[in-house]
């Protein structure tokens, strides 16, 4: 995990931002906005191409986010285009940018004091940077209405490859910005140019402010057709060009580095007709992201009400999983947490009523093993907005009650009422066109020429083009998902009465369990949860109730824990869906029989460097599952990632994380080693 260094930025006498690190200005001192419009918008002929575009989204990629001027300018242009062309099929703009040294939220605010036309957009981005910071490298997704911004923080040489096989032939236009090639040579290199070519659509374009001969030769060597035109202001010339259609290699499996993990977009015409099977938080965020893209979405819930299973607790903790031996899993949860904060703020802004407090989450080093894990976490130089290590006195002062140990604190974490949130958010989505069908137990799926037929327990059938399975521990009950290595985990959460001491708790505390602060009525707390693998029984357990009380009194052996009393037997039992490697599943539903047959000799094919087929999946069938005990944190980014995949848009996670989420990953680990899968 690499942490992000911020920019060495100062403002000149005329308020132009200047980089001390690169000894260069961020944009023209003559007119930065005019320069952006001339070099990048006109250089890529954006308005003309948008007017002729028959696709529903257009993808721009940029090297060097800087102050965000190019993004704000093109977002403003796209909004103007949409107002003037409301009937155009092009309804969404996707902007990808790379930045190694981001400016701070405060510097962003100063920069846009002189650009009033972009002040609202800049203020929105500034708000997210102030709340969340930029804790680690990787992709951070932000929504600006019809425009989506993905900023990949880190070195472009390491981040650009993480767009991966999936992004081959998907980018429409490039803004080659960043500082002068002579002052920032690490960014202007043949590896970047080759990846640009790979990711660019046939007849996709690029534009840049420079006319340096090394840049021109590098782009031509990669395969682009390069032209010169008059430069902006004092610059004599600048470059623009395209990826020739006649030279563009056909997309074949042999060009894909990891075809067994290649995500596959849905096939549909017109509006996507999507069925979601489920009724909890994974279904909610999948539905939200699909509706935002204009999909027709129908939800089929087995229960009589929504959020009756794992999403049905009175209070649940919201924070990233940091104590994992797999560094990739930690990165996933940090990015999921950052995106989840945005989605919860979206709910607040849309007046979704739900109890919540962003009161922070304390991680307690209650024994030798947990303390060692927290020491390992603290060894990273985290952004303080994400995590801060604390000694016993500091942690106790932060949470409001005495503690026997130190640990760490996640200031933007907190708690929310999952059932209340999910049910009320679904009501909001219904007003936006979501169709909800409860008491619909879907028992079978069958593929048809135009999509899928769903059959319920009464024998009724429903037809949809695309199906998303998000039904928790019931996910593997279909013929198509029966071989997935999922298992149920029963969890009992105890609800306890508050008291004078317990009311002092002002943050969620985690030990070998967790306890929330009092609810908004100041009457009760939640503690939990039990963990019983391979159990779907939802009956109340006196033993588990007593264990929940015993754990906090053992792990945090302070006088106030004696006020924790579960004897009134108030509790709720849910069943979670889990998987052994502790990271969710998201993506295409794999065809087990075909994949194990076609990849049975994969080990030797790779050793001999022979072509390998793209993975055989069930067309237009997707899943989100195995969220375990971190569904509140992971569901928002998983739902967004799934919707992006269905629509063939850029994905908000790095390729290595996408691979880790692939539902066929456990089979592929064996097949890649030459081990048979049974």
Curated annotation (Swiss-Prot):
Cofactor(s) for this UniProt protein: FAD
Protein keywords: Cytoplasm, FAD, Flavoprotein, Methyltransferase, Multifunctional enzyme, Oxidoreductase, S-adenosyl-L-methionine, Transferase, tRNA processing
Reactions mediated catalytically: 5-aminomethyl-2-thiouridine(34) in tRNA + S-adenosyl-L-methionine = 5-methylaminomethyl-2-thiouridine(34) in tRNA + S-adenosyl-L-homocysteine + H(+)
Record localization: Cytoplasm
GO-annotated cellular components: cytoplasm
Gene3D superfamilies: D-Amino Acid Oxidase, subunit A, domain 2 (3.30.9.10), FAD/NAD(P)-binding domain (3.50.50.60), Vaccinia Virus protein VP39 (3.40.50.150)
Renumbered residue ranges of the record's region tRNA (mnm(5)s(2)U34)-methyltransferase: 1-244
Predominant localisation class: cytoplasm
Swiss-Prot/TrEMBL GO biological process terms: methylation; tRNA wobble uridine modification
EC number: 2.1.1.61, 1.5.-.-
GO molecular function: flavin adenine dinucleotide binding; oxidoreductase activity, acting on the CH-NH group of donors; tRNA (5-methylaminomethyl-2-thiouridylate)(34)-methyltransferase activity
Region ranges (FAD-dependent cmnm(5)s(2)U34 oxidoreductase): 277-678
Family affiliation: In the N-terminal section; belongs to the methyltransferase superfamily. tRNA (mnm(5)s(2)U34)-methyltransferase family. In the C-terminal section; belongs to the DAO family.
Function according to Swiss-Prot or TrEMBL: Catalyzes the last two steps in the biosynthesis of 5-methylaminomethyl-2-thiouridine (mnm(5)s(2)U) at the wobble position (U34) in tRNA. Catalyzes the FAD-dependent demodification of cmnm(5)s(2)U34 to nm(5)s(2)U34, followed by the transfer of a methyl group from S-adenosyl-L-methionine to nm(5)s(2)U34, to form mnm(5)s(2)U34.
Protein known as: tRNA 5-methylaminomethyl-2-thiouridine biosynthesis bifunctional protein MnmC
Native organism: Actinobacillus succinogenes (strain ATCC 55618 / DSM 22257 / CCUG 43843 / 130Z)
Gene (UniProt): mnmC
